[in-house]
Curated annotation (Swiss-Prot):
Family per similarity comment: Belongs to the sea anemone sodium channel inhibitory toxin family. Type I subfamily.
The keyword Glycosyltransferase is annotated on this UniProt entry: no
Keywords: Cardiotoxin, Disulfide bond, Ion channel impairing toxin, Nematocyst, Neurotoxin, Secreted, Toxin, Voltage-gated sodium channel impairing toxin
Gene Ontology annotations for the cellular component aspect, listed alphabetically: extracellular region; nematocyst
Name of the protein this chain belongs to: Delta-actitoxin-Ael1b
Recorded GO MF terms: sodium channel regulator activity; toxin activity
Length: 47
C-alpha cells in the first residue's frame, strides 16, 4: 500500500515516519483510521 501520515506522526510529511497505510476504499476490518482530517476519498489507516 501507499504510506500516509497519521495524526500521531506529527504535522508535516517532511522528516516524519509515515506509519499509516492509504486505502482507497476505506480501512479494512481490524484497522482504524489514524487521521482525523484527511482526503475526501480513501482513508489513512493503521492496524
Amino acid at each position: 500500500g501507499i504510506a500516509c501520515l497519521c495524526d500521531s506522526d506529527g504535522p508535516s510529511v517532511r522528516g516524519n515516519t509515515l506509519s499509516g497505510t492509504y486505502w482507497l476504499a476505506g480501512c479494512p476490518s481490524g484497522w482504524h483510521n489514524c487521521k482525523s482530517s484527511g482526503q475526501l476519498i480513501g482513508a489513512c489507516c493503521k492496524q
